Amino acid sequence: MRQDDLKLLGKIVTTHGIRGQLKVASFSGEFDTILSLETVVLKGKDGRMETFPVARATVHHDRVLLSLTPFTNINEVLHLISAVSYAHRDQFPPLEEGEYYWCDLIGLQVVTAAGTVIGRLDSILPTESHDVYVVRGADREYLIPAVEDVVVQVDLEAGTMTVSPPEGLLDL
């Protein structure tokens, strides 16, 4: 199994209860993708990757509780704490037009409508009103609001995001 065929989801932070449930912290802050999975791939501290069927997934506060087959008690899952979770992209639920998974946006080259390269989309900060794209340029970092007026086009095929930043935004 090639790791580049997988998309990063989150990390196992601890166990929950005595029946072998695992608490997953989602890196994107959204849960629907993890809740819809039939299988999950876990990469342990030793770098080894294993695929497990998902028996059950539920939201618990700000985490997802995963029950994986064949585990039924806490002692069987202790070695999975701190494992990083991945899933095959084809398991993700479909999105509406104009919606994107974070994992598809990270790494895009960000350019202005005039064609000036700003940098690469490095990470995404979730906020109450909208996400903020962290773009790493040659000599600095830019914070670009993920709003319709600023993000003009996303072209996943070309690997680009075109933005029309308000005057002064790139000077901050």
Swiss-Prot record:
GO terms for cellular component: cytosol; ribosome. The gene is rimM. Binds ribosomal protein uS19. Belongs to the RimM family. It comes from Geobacter sulfurreducens (strain ATCC 51573 / DSM 12127 / PCA). The PRC barrel domain binds ribosomal protein uS19. It comes from the Bacteria. This is Ribosome maturation factor RimM. Keywords: Chaperone, Cytoplasm, Ribosome biogenesis, rRNA processing. PANTHER family: RIBOSOME MATURATION FACTOR RIMM. InterPro entries: PRC_barrel-like_sf (IPR011033), PRC_RimM (IPR056792), RimM (IPR011961), RimM_N (IPR002676), RimM_N_sf (IPR036976), Transl_B-barrel_sf (IPR009000). One of its GO terms (molecular function) is ribosome binding. It is found in: Cytoplasm. An accessory protein needed during the final step in the assembly of 30S ribosomal subunit, possibly for assembly of the head region. Essential for efficient processing of 16S rRNA. May be needed both before and after RbfA during the maturation of 16S rRNA. It has affinity for free ribosomal 30S subunits but not for 70S ribosomes. Residues 97-169 form the PRC barrel domain. GO terms for biological process: maturation of SSU-rRNA. Its main location: cytoplasm. The keyword Secreted does not apply.
